[in-house]
């Protein structure tokens, strides 16, 4: 009799357990929806179809239109995801290094160190470029080795001097992270996170790093006046006396070209563009950086050899060093600009009017 009651008890327990397992779960059952719930058995009509909100890149007076790749339109969802990835050390092999470590916001997304340090504590061999108005660049890296922001974002992940990771490992980590799974679904409507979409998101974020609110911008709008020293520096900058405008003219303050500006004699320790093109006349040439926010982006040049703007001006004032590929624009090579002390002070005063404090302080 006791055995009979025992079996009835066991049977009842199993029956209750089975009924519990069969309790229907309401949710979205459409696997193509953003909020798909694989555990749902009854569709409750909550499915959200994939759609993104375009991020409006502002049209800026004096700036050309930014060219956005057709296969990577800028969206609010993509920018949010890209910013999270940019700040997340999950991309590095040991989860200790993020993009932001070598491109710090308070330094206009550059590095105050001469060379950045990777996860192994090994220094790189070039100064980290400032990420400012990069959406208008035609090529990337000091040597022009990348032709798009998307292409450029691939390299630091696997570089042994930087994040020293593999894309296989990055993809595995991201696909095991439910927050990232949801964010990539919202931005790109994908279920499996791959390297192509990682760099697309980062590139979208980088295109939003726009600076156009410096003192000089306000001067051009007629909102404020320059000091006499700043105005004198402005005149020097745009004259043959200062010779700056040839490479740093227009409101972008760069020419999207490569120049040998007389830093070294031959043989070059760093071939720059020449290493990429294998053309001898390109040896020693490096990409012209923008002068916007130059006050925040020391040290200067591709190898960070100059610690101050005064040192940079003195380099051009002295005429630089001769080599067979030195740029023709260095007209006064061997002679120098021969600026007076006051003229150098005025020129630096003008360069500092290109500083955009909102860019480095804005939390949006």
Locations of regions flagged by a protein language model:
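C-terminal soluble interaction/assembly domains
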Residues: 324-333, 339
